[in-house]
C-alpha cells in the first residue's frame, strides 16, 4: 500500500472507529481490515467519501483536493457512477462558496456522464443544480429550460421542490401567472398547502 493510500486508509479507519464504536485495544478489528481491502480496490470511492467528509467539516480546500484526486482515478477507471457523484459533489462545493463559474462546468460534466450511464433521479437533481446556477448568475431563460428538463426526469416525491424553485424564479421575474401554475402543480405533491404557500412568500 503506497503512502497516500495508507493515509486514506487511516482516515477512513478513524471514521469507522468513531461511528461504529469499534475503539478498543485490538490493533485492527475485522471491519478495519475489510475497510482497507475496499479502499485498495476502490481508492476513487474512498477519495470521494473523504471529500464529502471534509466538505461537511467546512474544509473546502481539502475537500476539493480529495474530489480532484477521485476524478483523476475515476477518469482512468471509467467508473461513471463515481464520476457522476464526484462531479456533482465538486459542483456543490463550489456553489456553496458562490464560485458559480466553476460550479457550472462540474454539473455539466456530471450531466455528460449521465448520458453514458442514465439515472433519472441523478439526472433530475443535476439539471436542477444547473438551473439554480443559471438563476444565480442572472440567466433566467436558461434556468427555466433546465428546471423544466429537471421536472421531466424527476420522481413524484422530488418534483414539488423543483416546482417550488421554478415558481420562485417566476416570482422574481414578476410572472405571477406561471408562478401560480407551479404552486398548483406542487400542491398535490407536497401535502401541506400552508407550508407550500409559506415557501413562496419567503
Residue ranges of predicted features:
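Eukaryotic all-alpha helical interaction scaffolds
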Residues: 50, 54, 74, 94, ...
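Conserved alpha-helical positions within TPR/SEL1-like repeat arrays
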Residues: 32, 36-39, 48, 52-56, ...
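Alpha-helical solenoid repeat scaffolds used for protein-protein interaction
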Residues: 141, 148-202
